[in-house]
Regions:
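Membrane-interface transmembrane helices that cradle and orient dolichyl/undecaprenyl
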Residues: 105-107, 144-161, 170
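Transmembrane-helix signature of polytopic, membrane-embedded enzymes
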Residues: 94, 99-122, 155-159
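Start-transfer (signal-anchor) and selected internal transmembrane alpha helices
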Residues: 1-25, 110, 158
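Short acidic/glycine- and proline-prone juxtamembrane loop motifs at membrane-interface regions
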Residues: 127-138
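Hydrophobic alpha-helical transmembrane segments
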Residues: 15-16, 68, 86, 114-118, ...
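Extracytoplasmic catalytic/substrate-binding loops of multi-pass membrane glycan-assembly enzymes
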Residues: 29-44, 55-72, 79-82
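Transmembrane alpha-helices of multi-pass, membrane-embedded glycan-processing enzymes
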Residues: 62, 66, 70-74, 78, ...
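Membrane-interface alpha helices of multi-pass inner-membrane proteins
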Residues: 121, 159-175
Length: 177
């Protein structure tokens, strides 16, 4: 019971931040269809679940990473618009927690870390609300930079191993700058 109390007393801002980030992205994803919205990942993920594969069975204009990730999420939660938006919302929430953790590791007070990470979550994925190649590639690159910074501070060998893997995933999200 004491450990649970310590967890919630120290991490309540992180929990609030995660749910806020997921909510704001989910809200903006449901406002309607806009020119920035892309349905290609929806269709490609559906085709992957049907047994087709990018470049082998059909042509894609972006990297296959988002399509395979989205097909995994469709497999778990079902194929519908809310699940499609959930993919972007979860990435927004996870990235906001990473930014929050980075600011805390730099010694910034947790309230300021929360504020800056919340501002980041408002600007990050809600601009499109749906999975988008530029966002995934940028966020995976930001995650790579954060792991690089943490690796320099903590000197953990497994973190150095994650850097090239995340860079490959970022490349497979969007190959062209």
């Amino acid at each position: 019971m004491q450990n649970l109390k310590i967890f919630f007393s120290n991490n309540y801002l992180a929990i609030i931040l995660f749910f806020f980030s997921v909510f704001i992205c989910h809200f903006t994803g449901n406002r309607g269809v806009f020119p920035i919205d892309s349905f290609s990942h929806f269709d490609n993920a559906f085709r992957i679940l049907k047994g087709d594969h990018p470049f082998k069975d059909y042509w894609v204009v972006s990297g296959p990473f988002i399509d395979y990730l989205q097909s995994l999420i469709f497999l778990i939660f079902g194929i519908n618009w809310q699940t499609y938006i959930l993919s972007a919302s979860l990435l927004n929430g996870i990235l906001s927690l990473i930014i929050y953790s980075l600011f805390n590791n730099f010694g910034l007070h947790s309230r300021y870390s929360f504020f800056y990470a919340a501002c980041f979550s408002i600007l990050a994925y809600p601009s499109s609300g749906t999975p988008f190649v530029d966002h995934h590639s940028t966020f995976l690159s930001i995650l790579t930079l954060n792991i690089f910074i943490w690796s320099m501070i903590r000197d953990k060998a497994y973190q150095w191993f994650l850097i090239p893997i995340l860079m490959v995933f970022a490349f497979l999200s969007k190959q062209v700058p």
